[in-house]
Amino acid sequence: MRINYLDDDDLAFLPECSEAHLEAFTRILTHGENGKPRLSSTLLRNETFLAMEGHPERYRRNWQLIAGELQHFGGDSIANTLRRHGKFYRAILLDVCKRLKAKVDKQLSTPQIEQQLLAHFLQHSWNKLNAEQKAQFLAAVECRSHELDSLMAHLLRHRKLSEGVTLLLDERLTAILRTHAAVSVIGHGLVRGAGLNSVKAVSGSAYRVTIPAVLHIACLRQMLQPPSDTAEIGEKYPARS
């Protein structure tokens, strides 16, 4: 299967990531939470990607195919077919911000918007956890502080941001998607009889893929930054309610 990758400056950093980190990110795109391959994945049917199975740099050498897969999932499925490619990452990022109700400044750079999204997600997810879940989370990321600002700094300082976000997604993604599904049903009712306006509501972005994928991309970018740059995320870009 052919994957048409849009040349995207916001994804050009991917080959700088470690092979292990890229493999973990790719699995978000290609496999569901139950571990089963996604039927909608084009990457798992791509001959070039399949031919490199077992190669020590399979993911880094195919980063454009992986990025194209994300763009594919971020675009409207019908529109993808017509234009033969997906959406730029920034558009996907802003779409996820809207879905998670993260109020971000669209005039900022993509990395800055990602930082606002991460701060929003960590704050709101943390507040939804019960005492037992918080204790399990803190133990998993090896943090003793229950204060959110200290937790953010800890995740960044010890390079556990991706792990922390993944753990929170395991707890919160189902609830997030349930809310999205309810909104979608209401939306479908509102646009019924509106002709082509209803098509986008039915065939829109695959949020089960794009929400964790965008959060993971944001983590990967943060982890590549020097500690002095990442330590300010909680202070410089507090979650906006």
Regions found by a protein language model. Name each.
Residues M1-K128:
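N-terminal leader/propeptide segments of preproteins
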Residues M1-T30, G204-S241:
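Amphipathic, membrane-inserting segments
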Residues G54-Y59, A131-A139, L177-H180:
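Phosphate-binding glycine-rich loops and adjacent basic patches that engage nucleotide phosphates
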Residues V104, P111, L129-L138, G195-I217, ...:
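Short, Lys/Arg-enriched charge-dense amphipathic segments
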Residues L117-L156:
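Membrane-active amphipathic alpha-helices
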Residues H146-R208:
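Membrane-inserting effector segments that mediate pore formation, membrane fusion
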